[in-house]
Amino acid sequence: MANHKSALKRIRANRAKYLRNRYQMKTTRTFVKRLRASTVKADANELYKKVSGMLDKLAKRNIIHKNNAANKKSKLAKFVNKLAA
């Protein structure tokens, strides 16, 4: 266990950051699952816009790598485009 005041503060800050990042990742994952489960193209398009923004935000905040976000967006776009109108 850390003894220095700054180290204790760093532990608290890291924990808070971890919880915030985990919450954002979990929320995004839930929306991705919801998008993959959708069968109506109009609904999927709306959800895709939202999920795309969420992935971009995660990449911007360095929670996930920008290429990871780009790959996920690409796969989701293919999925949405394959849906029957």
Swiss-Prot record:
GO terms for biological process: translation. One of its GO terms (molecular function) is structural constituent of ribosome. The keyword Lipoprotein does not apply. Pfam families: Ribosomal_S20p (PF01649). Keywords: Ribonucleoprotein, Ribosomal protein, RNA-binding, rRNA-binding. InterPro entries: Ribosomal_bS20 (IPR002583), Ribosomal_bS20_sf (IPR036510). It comes from the Bacteria. The keyword Ribonucleoprotein applies. GO terms for cellular component: cytosol; small ribosomal subunit. Binds directly to 16S ribosomal RNA. Belongs to the bacterial ribosomal protein bS20 family. This is Small ribosomal subunit protein bS20. It comes from Cytophaga hutchinsonii (strain ATCC 33406 / DSM 1761 / CIP 103989 / NBRC 15051 / NCIMB 9469 / D465). The gene is rpsT.
